[in-house]
Each structure stands twice: as structure tokens, then as C-alpha cells.
Regions:
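Switch/coupling sub-region of P-loop NTPases
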Residues: 31, 35, 41-47, 60-185
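Phosphate-binding/switch region of NTP-binding enzymes
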Residues: 171-206
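Conserved glycine(s) of the Walker
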Residues: 53
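Hydrophobic positions on the alpha1 helix immediately C-terminal to the Walker A/P-loop
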Residues: 57
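Conserved small/polar residues in nucleotide/adenosyl-binding loops
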Residues: 226-232
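The conserved Walker
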Residues: 50
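Non-catalytic accessory segments flanking P-loop/AAA+ NTPase cores
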Residues: 202-225
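P-loop NTP-binding catalytic core
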Residues: 1-43
Length: 236
């Protein structure tokens, strides 16, 4: 059938937190929670399937990063677009033709270089492989980092992070302090995006070595909105 290509169009003005509330992807209470988290440098992952709105939500919430902070973003395809003046965007580069790897600059190399720039916030478009280990090491040493990853729940997120090609040791997982689980679904025949859960990573059980989580928000399907739930600890 020949070659094909995909065009992903973006708004001239990126979606704002107010848009996320208007779309009912999140409630105003959840956005307020993330406002506090972003301003207080809480490392977080935005988790979901393809086209669930992970990067859109991450980009919208970045407006809450204090404007005087230095931000470095790293992507293979340019999607992050934030207004802060002290933002340094980084983009991966392919090799100089053919099968040669000469000249290739990947997310792993960009992330290592970014850590030498003394960033206060690091944004990685998506973690897929070796760059995730460097990102978690950065979190563990006090850097605030945000990224997206393909998974549909906290257990599947832990499974993806611990296994190849990402391969993060379980002892590093508590460096991640929270995650937002997003889904794409249909309501009355209309395709919508919803934040299914917002979960805090509490730590690791010293006896079972299971990851202890605290679910703060959960989407209530019956009212098509995100409601606050009572704190509930569980092991993953």
C-alpha cells in the first residue's frame, strides 16, 4: 500500500488546568492537589494507555511549576510546550544516515547531560528503557522529575518498571512519590479521557518488600467525575 505518515496537531495555546477541569478529565479538587504537588517538587509519573491524555495532562499541570525554576525537558518527539522563561528543551537525534549509530543522541545521553545543568525540574516525554534508571537516580538524589509511561494500573506500572527494558530495582521505586492513572473510555457513545486514580507511593514494606500505596482519588463512574476517596493503604 505504500508509505504512510501520521500528523499529530497541537493547539497554538496548550491546554490549561482549567481546560482539564472543563473536559472533566480531572475534578477541581484533584487539580488543586496537583498544584500543591508541583509547587512542592513532588516527583510524579503520568500513567495510561495510548491516547489517554498523559502528555496533555502533564503539560497542562506544568503551569504550576514556579516561574523562577530551571526546567529541562527531554523528548524524542516534541510535545511539551510550557511558558516558563527558564525552560531548556532537549530533543533526541537520529544517526547520520543508514544503519550507522554515529551521531545518535538518545534520551539516556540527554538526561545525563541535563543533570550537569543543575535543573530544578526535569521532564522526560516518556520513559521506555535505560533512561528510566538515570531518571530514578535523579529522583533519589533530590531532583523533581515528571514523565509518562504506558501502563493501566499501579501493579502494571510496578511490573513495567521492574522488568526489562526499563529494569528499575524495587529499592528505587519509593523515589517516585505519586502517579496519575489515566484512561480513554466512552460515555454515552462519546470518547472521553478520565483520571482513574491518583495514587501516592508511601514506601516499601520491610517484611514483604511490597510497594505500599495510598489511593487519594478515584474516578466514580456513576457520576462521571473524579471524587476524593478516604486514604487507603495497599501493597503492590
Amino acid at each position: 500500500r505504500g508509505s504512510s505518515f501520521c500528523i499529530r496537531r497541537f493547539k497554538d495555546d496548550p491546554f490549561s488546568p482549567a481546560d482539564i477541569i472543563a473536559f472533566r478529565t480531572m475534578s477541581s479538587l484533584m487539580v488543586s492537589y496537583l498544584w500543591i504537588a508541583f509547587q512542592n517538587e513532588v516527583p510524579m509519573l503520568f500513567v495510561g494507555g495510548t491516547a489517554s491524555g498523559k502528555t496533555t495532562t502533564l503539560n497542562a499541570m506544568c503551569i504550576f511549576i514556579p516561574w523562577q525554576m530551571k526546567i529541562v525537558s527531554i523528548e524524542s518527539t516534541r510535545e511539551v510546550n510550557i511558558p516558563q522563561p527558564n525552560w531548556v528543551p532537549g530533543l533526541t537525534r537520529q544517526g547520520f544516515g543508514g544503519e550507522s549509530t554515529e551521531g545518535v543522541i538518545g534520551e539516556f545521553e540527554l538526561l545525563k547531560a541535563a543533570l550537569r545543568e543543575r535543573p530544578e525540574y526535569i521532564i522526560v516525554g516518556e520513559i521506555r528503557g535505560a533512561e528510566a534508571y538515570v531518571l530514578f537516580q535523579a529522583m533519589a538524589t533530590g531532583h523533581c522529575a515528571y514523565s509518562t509511561v504506558h501502563a493501566d494500573s499501579v501493579p502494571s506500572l510496578v511490573h513495567r518498571l521492574e522488568n526489562k527494558p526499563i529494569d528499575i530495582p524495587r529499592v528505587l521505586l519509593p523515589a517516585l512519590e505519586a502517579c496519575s492513572i489515566q484512561i480513554q473510555t466512552r460515555i454515552n457513545g462519546k470518547r472521553v479521557r478520565r483520571t482513574k486514580q491518583l495514587v501516592e507511593i508511601v514506601g516499601i514494606d520491610p517484611n514483604s518488600l511490597e510497594v505500599i500505596t495510598n489511593e487519594v482519588f478515584r474516578w466514580d463512574v456513576t457520576v462521571s467525575y473524579t471524587h476524593l476517596t478516604l486514604p487507603t493503604n495497599s501493597n503492590v
